[in-house]
């Protein structure tokens, strides 16, 4: 089970991490335009 962890973790990090970065960047740009 532990040997299968990286095969699940890598795609999750590859999808979740950019999604969080894009969300933070979007919020930063939106608040910057409002302010």
Swiss-Prot record:
Membrane topology classification: Single-pass membrane protein
| Disulfide bond sites | none
Organism expressing this protein natively: Cyanophora paradoxa
Q: Which GO terms describe its cellular component?
A: cyanelle thylakoid membrane; photosystem I
Q: Looking at the keywords, is rRNA-binding present?
A: no
Name of the featured protein? Photosystem I reaction center subunit VIII
Query: What functional role does this protein have?
Result: May help in the organization of the PsaL subunit.
Q: Pfam families of this UniProt entry?
A: PSI_8
Its GO biological process annotations read: photosynthesis
The protein's location, in the record's own words, is:
Plastid, Cyanelle thylakoid membrane
Q: Where are the transmembrane segments?
A: 8-28
Q: Does the keyword Thylakoid apply?
A: yes
- So which domain of life are we looking at? Eukaryota
For this UniProt record, the keywords arranged alphabetically read as follows:
Cyanelle, Membrane, Photosynthesis, Photosystem I, Plastid, Thylakoid, Transmembrane, Transmembrane helix
